[in-house]
Amino acid sequence: MAAATLLRATPRFSGLCASPTPFLQGRLRPLKAPASPFLCRGLAVEAKKTYVRDKPHVNVGTIGHVDHGKTTLTAAITKILAEGGGAKFKKYEEIDNAPEERARGITINAAHVEYSTAARHYAHTDCPGHADYVKNMITGTAPLDGCILVVAANDGPMPQTREHLLLAKQIGVEHVVVYVNKADAVQDSEMVELVELEIRELLTEFGYKGEETPVIVGSALCALEQRDPELGVKSVQKLLDAVDTYIPVPTRDLDKPFLLPVESVYSIPGRGTVVTGTLERGILKKGDECELLGHNKNIRTVVTGIEMFHKSLERAEAGDNLGALVRGLKREDLRRGLVMVKPGSIQPHQKVEAQVYILSKEEGGRHKPFVSHFMPVMFSLTWDMACRVILPPGKELAMPGEDLKLSLILRQPMILEKGQRFTLRDGNKTIGTGLVTDVPAMTEEDKNIKWS
């Protein structure tokens, strides 16, 4: 299990699975979903405000089981901070703003809000919670510097609570703060204590410091409706204090060439095409030349504008959730999963050597071993791609719970480099987590692999 421990303890590759970004959230026309003309109104002009970098910037997000109150808590945070000028109040309906979310009553696409405490500036992602949307969970959690795990006091930990914690740990989220929500719906204080105990045991099981993790009990709905201050407003204030103190400000990699995994592509009438994502490393400046690589594309363009939370920037730094206006490209030229990089700084690869931990049955992985040429889907940065797994010479079976060195050949070349983390999934199961150790050239035998 040494390699498994290494994989789980290694600081994450900063580029794994970037999440949706807040660039003009809810007003643009995304690549695959039409927006009404009304939503795009007023975007033909430059942003009037300039983003001021006067506090440390930290990316956090809510995770947890469906209907445990993640979006309600996010709304409550903005309401409380808005009273002191640290946020713009976002109603539940505004956060839960995609048509499919409203229609089905569950959060499908991750939404973003911005707020500031006295100590920090936060970009907050409201992550999806339904089992069918774990794919979004994978691509929506990795850039987070920490998570707020929401657990309903009247339910306790549920299946997606476990799965979200497992995925968060696999993709490198090392710090979690817990909010036990809906405490107003539970009359028995002993039940709340049991839920807290169960959560701490679960955190420890997944490699977190369960005994040290802050656990705050409250009710996000009470905070929103300004009822029962102890369970409502004060509990959310305690949560924000815990996030400020327990989740550290990460060290940003500003010295390397910039790398921006593309999360979404939008078209703004009168201005052009915007790509959004989290800048994983380096500094991106207005006027920079860039390449967009992956999915058999190699597109060169120039960044003509940068914005974050409706505010313009002359330069963006690693960790920023941003939108970049690109010159001379149409929306249909681009897609999610491409990576914007400094020209010549990195190339796509189709084959990697990697140290991979295969999840056991108890961890939610496969029940049975697999053989060479097994074809799972690899998730890294914002892309996912089918791949063939090649076992080491003399190895016939890869067993659940095993850690081993594997070769993986992708269906198409994608951005991969040494130290990059990835997740392997088969159907609706996460089956493995890995770390790239080398990027060798393709052999003739590799090129002849069949994909049908």
UniProtKB/Swiss-Prot annotation:
One of its GO terms (biological process) is translational elongation. The modification Phosphoserine is found at residue 312. Residues 126-129 are annotated as: G3. Its EC number is 3.6.5.3. The modification N6-succinyllysine is found at residues 88, 234, 286. InterPro entries: EF-Tu_GTP-bd, EF-Tu_GTPase, EFTu-like_2, EFTU_2, G_TR_CS, P-loop_NTPase, T_Tr_GTP-bd_dom, Transl_B-barrel_sf. Residues 55-251 form the tr-type G domain. Residues 1-43 form a transit peptide. GTP binds at residues 67, 69-72, 181, 184, 219-221. Mg(2+) binds at residue 71. GO terms for cellular component: mitochondrial inner membrane; mitochondrial nucleoid; mitochondrion; myelin sheath. Its main location: mitochondrion. It catalyses: GTP + H2O = GDP + phosphate + H(+). Residues 64-71 are annotated as: G1. Keywords: Acetylation, Elongation factor, GTP-binding, Hydrolase, Magnesium, Metal-binding, Mitochondrion, Nucleotide-binding, Phosphoprotein, Protein biosynthesis, Transit peptide. Residues 181-184 are annotated as: G4. It holds the Pfam family GTP_EFTU_D2. Residues 219-221 are annotated as: G5. The keyword Zinc-finger does not apply. Interacts with NLRX1. Interacts with ATG16L1. Belongs to the TRAFAC class translation factor GTPase superfamily. Classic translation factor GTPase family. EF-Tu/EF-1A subfamily. This is Elongation factor Tu, mitochondrial. It comes from Mus musculus (Mouse).
